[in-house]
């Protein structure tokens, strides 16, 4: 089993958001030395407790500070961006760190509704087809497979290179797993969001998987919230503030 880290860049009491970002880089360096496989950073906006608002920038910092880790987003919230812009951004990251960049994608806003509107000034209600269409466009842009009759067929994503970021679809529901399977992409189940039904979601992913140019068999991982300590009592003590912060809605600093 390969162990990886999903870092939400929590802000400690008495520390600043800038401190939290620097601590994320330091933690990634330690994880690199300990043999962890992947290091993903999250996207949240307007949060009083989480500092990671620009994962694409933090990924570059972490990849530059480490030697072996695969580094990526867990994830980029696609509702805020165009597929082309995300493809270009992660192609740039891959140009500097070929074969080490992961692109995890999600559909949640990572914010409250007002902040989501501020992120997208031309905000309009998003149809159910919007996210799957973005994923298809993004995969085509990344892999230079835009169909010849598509309005975007003449667009070339720069830079291009010998490697491509590894795309992962993130989710906590069977619909997310089914979409990842239908698209033929790796799937990451967010157990830390939905602690129930993970086995059923992964089975739905495997059952609906269709081989793609990027992946010929299902590939998945699971994100869990973990507290490590010398004793169970100490682990419970460390976990309690996080539980209270989560139950309060995440606004207060952990």
What residue spans do the PLM features occupy?
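Flexible, glycine-rich active-site loops centered on histidine and acidic residues
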Residues: 2-17, 79-146, 187, 195
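Hydrophobic faces of well-ordered beta-strands that scaffold small-molecule active sites
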Residues: 3-7, 39-41, 71-74, 101-105, ...
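A conserved active-site cap/scaffold subdomain adjacent to cofactor or substrate pockets
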Residues: 177-196, 202
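Acidic (Asp/Glu)-rich catalytic clusters
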Residues: 32-33, 59-68, 90, 94-101, ...
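An alpha-helical appendage that flanks or caps ligand/catalytic pockets
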Residues: 124-157, 196-254
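Active-site mouth loops of central-metabolism enzymes
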Residues: 7-22, 74-84, 161-171, 226-229
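N-terminal beta1-alpha1-beta2 module of alpha/beta enzyme domains
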Residues: 1-69
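Generic structural signal for well-ordered alpha-helices
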Residues: 24-29, 56-60, 87-91, 132-139, ...
């Amino acid at each position: 089993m390969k162990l990886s880290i999903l870092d939400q860049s929590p802000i400690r009491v008495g520390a600043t958001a800038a401190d939290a970002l620097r601590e994320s880089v330091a933690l990634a360096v330690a994880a690199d030395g300990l043999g962890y496989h992947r290091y993903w950073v999250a996207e949240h906006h307007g949060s009083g407790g989480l500092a990671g608002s620009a994962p694409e920038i933090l990924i570059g910092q972490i990849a530059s500070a480490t030697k072996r880790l695969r580094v990526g987003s867990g994830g980029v919230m696609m509702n805020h961006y165009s597929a082309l812009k995300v493809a270009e951004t992660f192609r740039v990251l891959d140009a500097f760190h070929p074969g080490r960049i992961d692109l995890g994608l999600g559909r949640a806003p990572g914010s409250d509704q007002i902040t989501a509107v501020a992120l997208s000034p031309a905000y309009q209600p998003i149809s159910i087809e919007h996210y799957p269409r973005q994923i298809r466009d993004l995969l085509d842009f990344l892999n230079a497979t835009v169909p010849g009759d598509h309005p975007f067929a003449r667009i070339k994503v720069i830079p291009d290179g010998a490697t491509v970021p590894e795309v992962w679809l993130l989710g906590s529901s069977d619909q997310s797993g089914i979409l990842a399977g239908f698209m033929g992409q790796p799937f990451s189940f967010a157990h830390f969001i939905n602690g129930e039904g993970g086995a059923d979601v992964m089975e739905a992913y495997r059952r609906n998987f269709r081989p793609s140019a990027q992946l010929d068999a299902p590939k998945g991982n699971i994100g869990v919230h973990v507290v490590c300590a010398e004793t169970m009592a100490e682990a419970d003590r460390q976990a309690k503030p996080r539980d209270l912060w989560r139950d309060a809605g995440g606004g207060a600093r952990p």
